[in-house]
Amino acid sequence: MYMCRTYNGFDINSIESYKKNIRSVIDNGTLYDDVFSGVVKDSRGNICPTTIILPTLAMQAKKKIESELKKATAKGIDWAEGAEETKTIEYFMELLDKKIHEAKDSLLERFDWITSQPAASAKFMYENGTMGGYVKDEGIKSALRHGTIVIGQLGLAETLQILIGEDHGKIVRDETTNELLMTKGMDLAKRIEQLFKTRCAEFKNEYKLNFGVYYTPAENLCYTAMKKFKAKYGVIEHVSDHDYFTNSMHVPVWEKMTPFEKIDIESQLTGYSSAGSMTYVELDGSAKNNLQAVEELVNYAMDKDIPYFGINLPNDICNSCGYTDDIPGEVCPKCGTKGNISRLRRVTGYLTGDYKTAFNYGKQRETEDRVKHTCVDA
């Protein structure tokens, strides 16, 4: 189940342009600036993405500051309490800022190469109007300039564990109001996301292209990046003790919480993304018979301004008799056949056959590690 909110239609990095577009459409029926407009949804899409692997930068920062502390200690210089953590965070932010600029440079080069191709390279896309805005005399750049050029990220949760020893999924509530309180992890998470948002807004204004913050689904990268990370840094508790990195800014799939709590946490970060994000909750098969509960969740996500929301339900199919339900084991409860069960799961937004054959080992393990977000205290 998906839901996209019209309220999220404008680009939060260009609110002024959005307002001018509304005024322009009212006055003369045309957009003030369609490149910066989130009003136009059809006939454009994501042109080229680059993903920054955040935990690698965090480890680089941690190792650098640990080395500096060791040298200072050898010289008899004491650091103030908390100085190591503060210095590590600051150096990480420097590395991240540099990497965001490198991503921008690579994306500009890719965009120039992509738009140098003739329309004949994808005739259907341009001459049939699939990509809007195409002007024959101007080439395919006339159409692709309306799409997004995005800087993505992977492993925010693991990055926070490296930097401060906790992620943003910690739930702390006010004892009187029961409201979710700001945690150390969420505070740093917002600082990191703000840097992405600020830089992409600057790049938009400078290059007149739709640079945006992208919460990468990492179908393959979650696994390949973790393999390289482990090879260099080994197994670190709460960081590399799984076979995958957590997608973008998601709460780790193994953390127990209610669906409402997951929405509460992730809704604080979705607004930093102007080029794609998703929040999902995992329910058991009984939710199929409780539409009232499903509707309550959808309404809650809308109230929290989640732009793209999914509810994941297990859907197992016996290939022998066609029985469909949540089948926990390898034996079909209807016909008794063993080992002929296909398991359909949503993985990074896709429903693509049996997840055990359609995705790599890391995504398979991530899917199996997912906890059900029950509506009771975790």
Indicate residue ranges for each PLM-predicted region.
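Contiguous, well-ordered alpha-helical segments that form the cores/surfaces of helical PPI scaffolds
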Residues: 149-162, 346
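Short clusters of hydrophobic/aromatic residues that line enzyme substrate/ligand-binding pockets
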Residues: 359
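Acidic, low-complexity intrinsically disordered tails
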Residues: 369-378
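Conserved catalytic cores of very large enzyme subunits
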Residues: 1-145, 166, 172-178, 182, ...
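Metallocofactor- and cofactor-centric catalytic cores in central/energy metabolism, strongly enriched
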Residues: 161-162, 363-366
